[in-house]
Amino acid sequence: MNAEDILSEIQDIMRDVFDLDDLVVTPNTSAEDVEEWDSLSHVRLIVAIERKFKFKFKNSELDSLKNVGDLANVVKSKTA
């Protein structure tokens, strides 16, 4: 899976988790950009990504995430 495919999958997951059908994400999108992105929805997002891509994040990986691009990079490294 390439970076664009991963970003597209993450966008679909985020649309579902945040209930925003028209949400468009870029690698620079962060929690500050999405009003619905609070601590509870963040947990739901992480769980949904883990289920979709069939892996578990390490706490250190989660701590280092600053935006969707960072998230996509971790997913890519875990699914390569």
Region spans (language model):
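Phosphopantetheine-dependent thiolation modules in NRPS/PKS and related acyl-activating systems
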Residues: 2-37, 41-46, 51-80
